[in-house]
UniProtKB/Swiss-Prot annotation:
It comes from the Eukaryota. It is found in: Chromosome, Telomere. Disulfide bonds: none annotated. Disruption phenotype: Critically short telomeres. Keywords: Chromosome, Telomere. The keyword Kinase does not apply. Component of the telomerase holoenzyme complex, composed of the catalytic core (the catalytic subunit TERT, the telomerase RNA template component TER and TAP65/p65), which is associated with two heterotrimeric subcomplexes: (i) the replication protein A (RPA)-related subcomplex, composed of TEB1, RPA2/TEB2 and RPA3/TEB3 and (ii) the CST-like subcomplex, composed of TAP75/p75, TAP45/p45 and TAP19/p19. TEB1 and the CST-like subcomplex are tethered to the catalytic core by TAP50/p50. This is Telomerase-associated protein of 50 kDa. The keyword ATP-binding does not apply. It comes from Tetrahymena thermophila (strain SB210). Tethering component of the holoenzyme telomerase ribonucleoprotein (RNP) complex. Telomerase is an essential ribonucleoprotein enzyme that copies new telomeric repeats onto chromosome ends by repetitively synthesizing the short telomere-repeat sequence 5'-TTGGGG-3' using an RNA template component TER. In the telomerase holoenzyme complex, acts as a hub that anchors the two heterotrimeric subcomplexes with the catalytic core. The lineage of its organism: Eukaryota, Sar, Alveolata, Ciliophora, Intramacronucleata. One of its GO terms (cellular component) is chromosome, telomeric region.
Length: 422
């Protein structure tokens, strides 16, 4: 974990304060395994949480919050730890949140949290990045590891500090970005050195807090750091650390190159295995397809045989059917001729019957006509007789009328003779 402090005086005061706190805790609680309560008095109320990422520390999630009595309470599972710092001089209000490893920070305000495993204290330094700078809004988390048997295993600082820290905000921000990039690419070392070379800019130092089991590079860097600590972190120390960091990065790069070669070979072998596996799978697939084709060919041959047999049966059936149809047609023709003869005979008989019926009908008609003629003749004679009788009566009546008129004329007076028109 990378850590950045500002000032030798602050560094010394911080170290003395931590040592005093540890001694106080150790004198008060001889059996550290039984410790369950620490108190921490702070200058301001705060709310934060933290998830421990170090395997040698608490692995459970740690949640902390300030109670009404301004006490910091840490919770790990079912166990609660309340941390208490009696010395308020080094405490200031702070903010806290999760950050990835290798975070580089600039300390301005801070507070502490403490928890332990077995005989080792984990002292966390909670740092508030400068709130007055809009471009820096991130809050970083840094830690100091302490062990009773080996003392302070790692700490770091910057050799300059200014009360006018706001004037250096842009330089601090740029230096932080460069240091972050340094962890990935050593080409920024010269740029970093040039940016820290000027006395008008704050000088930054790289630091690694070490675990109990250090590798060779960590041990060398630890000795280099101790030498720089004796030299009060002068410019020569800065150059030595930068040069050593450059060498370490080269070693890491070479190691990475070797690892890349090995990884490349492993990748090639893996790809060959995958290719071989794919080839085997392809062969199996082709074999399956060939088997399917063979089965389809057998099926097609079977279908062709069945089709030929069906065609033969159809031809035989059609031949038999044609023969049977011819016989049926001849038989039908014969039956038709026979039927025609019967029909002709029936028609002839019917004609004779009809002829007889017509003759009888004609006779009846003639008889009826004769009867009607006779009847009409009788009626006509009767009518003539009646007419003659009527005419005779009318003539007689006329004669009578004429007679009467003559009689009347004969007996009229003489004076009426002048009016006669006869």
């Amino acid at each position: 974990m990378k850590l950045l402090l500002q000032n030798q005086n602050i560094f010394q005061k911080l170290k003395n304060t931590l040592n005093g706190c540890i001694k106080k805790f150790y004198d008060t609680y001889q059996d550290l395994e039984q410790m369950q309560k620490f108190e921490m008095i702070v200058e301001d109320k705060l709310l934060f949480r933290y998830s421990c990422s170090q395997s040698e520390m608490f692995s459970a999630q740690i949640q902390a919050h300030y109670l009404e009595k301004r006490v910091l309470q840490l919770t790990d599972g079912n166990v609660k730890y309340i941390v208490n710092f009696r010395d308020k001089g080094v405490l200031d209000k702070a903010n806290f949140f999760d950050t990835p490893n290798n975070s580089l920070v600039i300390i301005r305000q801070w507070s502490y949290e403490i928890y332990y495993t077995k005989n080792t204290f984990q002292i966390n330094l909670v740092i508030d990045e400068m709130r007055c700078i809009d471009i820096i809004t991130t809050i970083f988390y840094c830690k100091l590891e302490l062990d009773f048997t080996q003392g302070i295993k790692g700490i770091s600082k910057s050799s300059s500090f200014s009360n006018q820290i706001y004037e250096y905000s842009a330089q601090y921000y740029k230096a932080i970005q460069l240091l972050k990039k340094l962890l990935i690419n050593d080409s920024y070392i010269s740029e970093l050195y040039n940016s820290t070379k000027s006395k008008q800019q704050p000088r930054l130092f790289i630091f690694q807090s070490f675990k109990p089991k250090m590798n060779l590079a960590e041990q060398n860097l630890s000795r280099q750091f101790e030498q720089c600590q004796q030299d009060d972190f002068g410019d020569g120390c800065l150059l030595q650390i930068v040069n050593y960091t450059h060498q370490s990065l080269k070693q890491i790069e070479n190691k990475n190159n070797s690892n890349q070669i090995v990884n490349g070979q492993n990748e090639i072998s893996k790809k060959k295995r995958v290719l071989k596996s794919n080839e085997d799978l392809y062969k199996i697939s082709l074999q399956k397809q060939l088997k399917i084709f063979q089965e389809e060919e057998i099926e097609l041959h079977s279908q062709s045989t069945i089709r030929n047999q069906t065609n033969q049966q159809l031809e035989t059936f059609e031949s038999d059917t044609s023969k049977r149809n011819s016989e049926k047609i001849l038989h039908s023709i014969n039956e038709l001729n026979t039927s025609k003869q019967k029909v002709n005979q029936m028609n002839s008989s019917q004609h004779q019957i009809q002829k007889l019926e017509n003759n009888n009908l004609n006779k009846n008609i003639l008889n009826q006509i004769n009867e009607n003629d006779i009847k009409n003749e009788l009626e006509e004679r009767q009518q003539q007789h009646l007419t003659q009788s009527f005419n005779s009566k009318a003539q007689l009546k006329k004669i009578i009328t004429l007679k009467k008129n003559q009689d009347i004329l004969l007996f009229k007076p003489q004076e009426q003779e002048g009016s006669k028109k006869y």
